[in-house]
Amino acid sequence: MHFFYDRPAAVQKWLGDLIEVVEGAGNITVLKGAKLKRLDGQLGRFQALIRTSEGRERTLSPSAVVVATGCITRPAEAMSDGGRCIGSSEMEKLLAESRDLPVAWKGQPVKTVTFILDRTDDDIKIHTVNAIKLAVILQEKGCQVAVVARDLKVSASGMELLYRQARGKGVLFFKYDEPPVLSHSGDGISVEIPDMTVLRKEERETVSLLSDLVVIGETFAADPETQELCRVMKLRTGAGGALMEDNPQFLRVMSNRRGIFLAGACRFPQIIAESLSEAHAVVQEVKALLHGGVYTPVNPVAEVDPPKCAVCYTCVRLCPHAAIGVERYGDRNVYSAPAEKNGDTLWQAARVDPAACFGCGICVAECPARAITLYQ
């Protein structure tokens, strides 16, 4: 990304300045090229095994963890022919490289550009933001621009103003129900859509937009390394491998494990302003959670009666919050049980970590030995 949609500033310079501030802070350690190999413990006492870029292993003891791995983009199907269909990120790079010069594609001037939205992800508004932002820049460079969309999403802050600005500069907007038909026409591409201003479908005529370039939003996907990270951290994934599916019981920045937070596009593709808002929200959540150095559960938590536990691992497998483990119980163990089992003073039994328990009650309902109860 090279341009903000809501202010005239270079994204890369802004990002570079932020990186310099972080790397120059005395209380922040930056480990470039490092990988998380293992994460044990719970809120306030995590144990993270890190492998550095030099191949050495290092153990960290964070009180909380924030995941902000982002996502990757994949080209849309219509761009697979390698012709004059490009992605929005490629168009943004082209405009950044052209600077004050006229826009050119492979040595040929670009006079007409058509943006096609909602072919990949209908629920993501970042495509609309990027399209209108780039359309304004192209129009200022003397290009004729059209935006074809099923539904324009201008709910982001400042987007309605940018939309009106784009229309004022001459950007054309078209709505469609059926996906546009693309065909090669001479040295350009013809984009055919029905005229949606006519109410009767059978009376609609076809509008043909001859374009030097067609820009299509890419598909966003979870990074394969993020999948491995979720396995190590025991985090749940939603559709497409993104971290955490929508859950009305959790805030956007919360994960299924207490003390582990999410920010940015690792959960859902979004614009910079939304990622910054989530980052500020994470800061406040971490401060509230760790304030005073003591965490007191506000909801009922599960408790295991060790002598009744059959060590069947049902609760361990079913717990969505990784709050249950199997511990050794005995006189010398901190989790001691007064009774004996089969004449042995040492045995294994499940144990619920109160700091990690959300009180959902799944383990209580599924325990075949009825060894788990909820208490306040």
Locate the predicted segments by residue.
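Residues forming the flavin
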Residues: M1-Q376
